């Protein structure tokens, strides 16, 4: 790697998914990087190691279907931009039906190793407990949902904005050999085959109507973690609701959510349709650990063990990790950040990852990727044109930095975190109306064709952007 002669390195604060990706992109552009990570000097309430890019919640990067799914499209775009996160994910994938899931320890180790071995990256362990020094002229702040209190307070004082917060919950992990396979079975929903998968990638635990009703009642009645006074009004992110909160919304809610009994047949009793099904997904490459899909929870640990062992097949479950809560903090990005993710009040500071209001592993890494490219371009005195809004990266960036609706029905509307989805993309100029066979598209076929057209447009536009903007900026 050829180093570009610049007096000051770029500082990246936070070694999660976004910070790791940002540091990688900057270094790959030939610019020195100092990556600051406070762990293990100071740990968070959710992390368990000092690894960079540690996955705290699920081990799933969600769908890898670039033609039909927005997050799969985001995967494809990041791969085209030589994403370290996607490279490590692909190298450490585990079977997960149509999803891309990873061995979390192998993934974090791969990212950590790549960054530690890069000649232009210096990793500094220690907390940055306030605004970066004035002589740090180019900074990416990617400290994530668990930003330390001193740094969060300094950012709040600088911006004059109250931080917005919500809670994410973490799902339990079970040792595979403690699951009773006379009751559970392997099958992906609708036998779908995904990257590294076979169509039989999930463990399924069936419930009768009586078992389901008793389970829901136990979730609602179980003892939960108490909130501190300052936490009581903090909402949950809808994409990561605790299982018991979903249960409180109605007795049938879980049957239309993570416990839906569709696309699966119990080989132990094939003529009887389960009333509800609990799925577990492989969590490590060895296949020794499985996480409970959609079972993030704020139940107390004793209650988790008691209630989850009433699930058929999990009566003797040995839990490698029980569920828990962690708090997320993010900026009012449309108001505070420009299109380059720079803080309007102090442009030397750029933000990336979940702090900006994107939600999800891949989304955080994607925004880290863009922040890294922008910071590298700034370092050589050349602004990088943002990716087109027709791409997944551009659509997500647009939501964060300006696509948010400030008012609705003459009232204020708060900025909330967002996963990538096709609703963020500009509509097609000419939506598909007929299939390859010439027949008029209707219903689900029309929806599928629209998604495929959006994806095809995105990848074509991304390729042009890489050629016209990224390579030009890199050559400056």
UniProtKB/Swiss-Prot annotation:
Annotated catalysed reactions: uridine(54) in tRNA + (6R)-5,10-methylene-5,6,7,8-tetrahydrofolate + NADH + H(+) = 5-methyluridine(54) in tRNA + (6S)-5,6,7,8-tetrahydrofolate + NAD(+); uridine(54) in tRNA + (6R)-5,10-methylene-5,6,7,8-tetrahydrofolate + NADPH + H(+) = 5-methyluridine(54) in tRNA + (6S)-5,6,7,8-tetrahydrofolate + NADP(+)
Compositional bias per record (Basic and acidic residues), positions renumbered to this chain: 436-447
Pfam families: GIDA
Region of interest (Disordered), residue spans: 428-447
Keyword Lipoprotein part of the UniProt annotation: no
Top-rank lineage group of the source organism: Bacteria
GO molecular function: flavin adenine dinucleotide binding; tRNA (uracil(54)-C5)-methyltransferase activity, 5,10-methylenetetrahydrofolate-dependent
UniProt subcellular location: Cytoplasm
Gene Ontology biological process: tRNA methylation; tRNA wobble uridine modification
Co-factor requirement: FAD
Record: residues binding FAD: 14-19
Enzyme Commission number(s): 2.1.1.74
UniProt keyword terms in alphabetical order: Cytoplasm, FAD, Flavoprotein, Methyltransferase, NAD, NADP, Transferase, tRNA processing
Gene Ontology CC: one annotated term: cytosol
NCBIfam families: gid_trmFO (TIGR00137), PRK05335.1 (NF003739)
Similarity annotation: Belongs to the MnmG family. TrmFO subfamily.
HAMAP family membership: TrmFO
Function noted in UniProt: Catalyzes the folate-dependent formation of 5-methyl-uridine at position 54 (M-5-U54) in all tRNAs.
Protein name: Methylenetetrahydrofolate--tRNA-(uracil-5-)-methyltransferase TrmFO
Organism per entry: Rhodopseudomonas palustris (strain BisA53)
Gene: trmFO
